Amino acid sequence: MSEFFHISVLLRECLDGLDIKPDGIYVDGTLGGAGHSSQIAKRLTTGRLIGIDRDPIALKAAGERLKPFENNVTLVHSNFCEIAQVLQDLNVSGVDGILLDLGVSSPQLDDAARGFSYMMDAPLDMRMNSQDTLDAYQVVNTWSQEELRRILYTYGEERYAPQIAAAICRRRAEKPIETTLQLVDVIRSAMPPAALREKQHPAKRSFQAIRIAVNDELGSVEKVMRDAIPLLNPGGRLAIITFHSLEDRIVKLGMAEAAKGCTCPPSFPVCVCGKKPKVKLISRKPIVASDEELEANPRSRSAKLRVCEKL
């Protein structure tokens, strides 16, 4: 279990946001090291926790941590975006809370062999699920220059995307780019000296972009925003932690759309559109880490929690 130790971000805020009932049914769609889940399970008596993770290593570690609660816990190896299918397979028609902690976890970042980190040398991989076929090596060495430019700009918000994409294509024409530090070297070579002196690591945005592409992270968030709310019982809550603006935008817009009621013009004497809000927002603004948490866990700095409740 020590191989997958992960400090849970916004733990107290998530538990408050989910408003856990001892007899409720809850889903942790991004189980990880079960930091959030172990605290949810601790609060259940006759309730049930369904834990989902696409990473088999995380799932195994979570199983160990959740052993004291095994009578109340069901673990499933799947992607959180398949939550509707998972619940259907388990004959669960509705749940009282869904928690998603998006992005890559600390153990995945810290395990050099996984290829997520630009600080340690490893084969280009970046798969959250090692059984998936697409990896970072394929993206870097086989995708077209235009495809690379697009993901670097769109997913990494990298201003030097055209230069980096061109540099990758030039280097791989000589020989394949096989490791993380080889890729870092290519990225550095494409950036002007001023950019290399910035506080942020020059490869951070590019690595984020490639990781998002490999794991279809934004597609998964878009799908779960369509599917999760209908799965909630009335009064059930959806709590989602994001770590970058692209994910947060999808979650923010998805919740705002679900919270919208009548869209008729103010001049209409009665509603003719028939639209009713599906949820209410628990907080208009995202919940962020406290100063104490930031000091204890600097990785929580970019975390944003949004919560809504099914009407």
Language-model segment annotations:
Residues M1-L311:
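S-adenosyl-L-methionine-dependent methyltransferase catalytic core, i.e., the SAM/SAH-binding region
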